[in-house]
């Protein structure tokens, strides 16, 4: 990787993507929307074909999964979120079934190539370190294995430490975009969801350790545990 930081535009950065490449997108709130949009513009212009897109759950639009991009982008996701559920169920997009803890192994063992990793990071500190913030999961392995790493520098990305910290020398192109991170917003549980939450909460003992998923039912369960210890 280059040690020289390169600041550029999204349109210039995504020019490193070639037909047939495998592209990783960072997850959830860290989905790099400005890079995604720039990549899709290249697809619309007929500059790309057979590009494989990999990611876990992402928030926000997933324009590369639109059937109009058949033959241009192939979605091979590690998680089926609401923004790609319909196209996956229709058979247009593919899902790779795997445990979350093992997704990084796909890149490290070479089972899934990674030519370009498109990520979001916080601004670099005085030592040149940035943080992956809300998306470490498979993104760290993608950064380590990719031929090119394109990072959106966003002041709203939290500076998480530990394995989330990477040095800017690992990044080939920096793009500035301070768009607030996308939030997952849920409505209040309805009558059925509340009833399910009550039944589940009754089975949970005080002092229990919980692993919660995403969505209305986990939120309904948690809402019934406010007076528990």
What are these regions (language model features)?
Residues 1-229:
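Conserved alpha/beta enzyme-core scaffold
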